[in-house]
């Protein structure tokens, strides 16, 4: 997997993890995000980290549908410019269009796009080539965030006429029905989509600010998401190595005593050569990082 994400997305998850009683520093480290990425100047982290955060969050809190909880305890500005592009838009529909147009300022690994905008409906799709639970939770979070934000801005309970998810149907989808306000939710679909009818699409935002919206759009047009620094890949590698058992427990298992550079590169969605180059840029090597992981495992 290639690409990068804004640290704002990681902080978004970690804020909710902290509220749930988890240690955000430890959770970030387990996902491959070092303190420098979160506390330093604006930058980016490897695209794997955000999805790993969601997976770890769900696993440790042991509650289903944590992506839907993205709307809980929301603080204005958590997602930076994106928050204000959505809130200052003239209508709900314009907010969705702004989120789709400028979403690449937050992530290059996933995209939100308007796939239908007709006389009667507006449909957005959260697209990614990535499979797995992290991607499923990220899709939940994207739709939960947008729905909650436009409800707040419009001062109305915006109810989608249809929502589809690629994920398999959960045993109980009451939480989805309760949050979105509709039973028209399909699981196992070909794409993650959310559809609004004309009435909700054209609802006016009480927080609309045309002048500020224009300034924000001009700024977003020239903004771009940076490439993760070399050190970010060292943090991600350390997290991946630390997730392996010290010794092999079965023929098919991977452990710290058997893992190869090629295998770990595959797990990180890159090539062995690229991983070596990134480690060299950070002033380290595969052998050094593997030795460090074995020392940590030995305790």
Language model segments and positions:
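Short, contiguous, pocket-lining structural segments
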Residues: 19, 134, 138, 229, ...
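Extended mid-to-C-terminal alpha-helical interaction segments
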Residues: 170, 178-299
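N-terminal regulatory/effector-sensing and dimerization cores
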Residues: 80-200
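Residues within well-ordered alpha helices
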Residues: 16, 26-27, 149, 240, ...
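N-terminal low-complexity or simple alpha-helical regulatory segments
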Residues: 1-122
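Short amphipathic alpha-helical face segments that pack within enzyme cores
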Residues: 12, 141-145, 297
């Amino acid at each position: 997997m290639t690409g990068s994400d804004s640290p704002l997305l990681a902080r978004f998850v970690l804020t909710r993890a902290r509220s749930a009683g988890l240690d955000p520093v430890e959770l970030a480290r387990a996902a491959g995000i070092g303190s420098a990425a979160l506390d330093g100047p604006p930058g980016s982290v490897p695209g794997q980290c955000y999805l790993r955060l969601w997976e770890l969050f769900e696993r440790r809190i042991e509650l289903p549908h944590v992506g839907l909880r993205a709307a809980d305890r929301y603080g204005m500005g958590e997602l930076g410019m994106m928050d204000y592009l959505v809130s200052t838009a003239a209508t709900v529909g314009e907010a969705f269009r702004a989120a789709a147009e400028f979403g690449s300022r937050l992530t290059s690994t996933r995209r939100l796009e308007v796939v239908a905008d007709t006389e009667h409906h507006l449909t957005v799709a959260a697209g990614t080539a990535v499979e797995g639970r992290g991607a499923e939770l990220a899709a939940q979070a994207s739709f939960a965030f947008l729905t909650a934000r436009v409800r707040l801005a419009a001062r109305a309970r915006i109810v989608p006429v249809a929502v589809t998810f690629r994920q398999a149907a959960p045993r109980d989808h009451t939480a989805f029905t309760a949050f979105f306000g509709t039973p028209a939710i399909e699981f196992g679909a070909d794409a993650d989509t959310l559809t609004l009818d004309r009435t909700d699409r054209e609802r006016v935002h009480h927080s609309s600010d045309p002048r500020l919206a224009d300034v924000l759009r001009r700024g977003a047009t020239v903004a771009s998401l940076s490439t993760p620094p070399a050190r970010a890949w060292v943090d991600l590698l350390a997290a991946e190595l630390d997730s392996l058992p010290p010794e092999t427990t079965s023929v098919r298992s991977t452990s710290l005593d058997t893992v190869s550079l090629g295998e770990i590169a595959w797990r990180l969605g890159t090539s062995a050569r690229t991983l070596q180059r990134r480690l060299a840029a950070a002033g380290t090597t595969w052998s050094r990082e593997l030795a460090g992981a074995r020392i940590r495992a030995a305790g």
